[in-house]
Amino acid sequence: MNIDPTTVNTHKVTTPDSRNNRLPILLIPFLLHKYGQATVPTMGGCNIGKRKVDFHLTAAEMFGATVETKESGYHAKSNGRLQGTHYTMPYPSVGATESCLFLSVLSEGTSVIRNAAIEPEIMELITMLRSMGAIIFLNPNREIIIEGVEKLTGTNMYVLG
């Protein structure tokens, strides 16, 4: 799989396939970093069923974005570069931990994510982000510390599974 973000030219995620999965919520951090705003449609379900996205939205706010929830979806906006923060998640959600990692790696300053998910896919994501230039430390007790960097580079990675 080749992922090329240089072809992205808008802060808006369109609806056609996005209501069938939960992926659009994970695009908010990237679009905030690139455009200073992100608009994503309301999430659809997945094999697990309908799940809330409030941890993702709260995380974006903790990093300095403002988030509006509308019937059609979510709009997040930042005034300049996102700022590192300390965020204790109410539950160790895999998706919300991914959002926090994506928000933090390009934010200014240090971020600490507490009560983070530690599933294998999170460890693989951290490995990938480190190979792209991210500075990430793991502490016991579900704590991840991230030093924000100015930019990330491309990478090659083999995915588990």
Model-identified regions with their sequence ranges:
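Structural preference for solvent-exposed beta-strand-turn elements
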Residues: 1-161
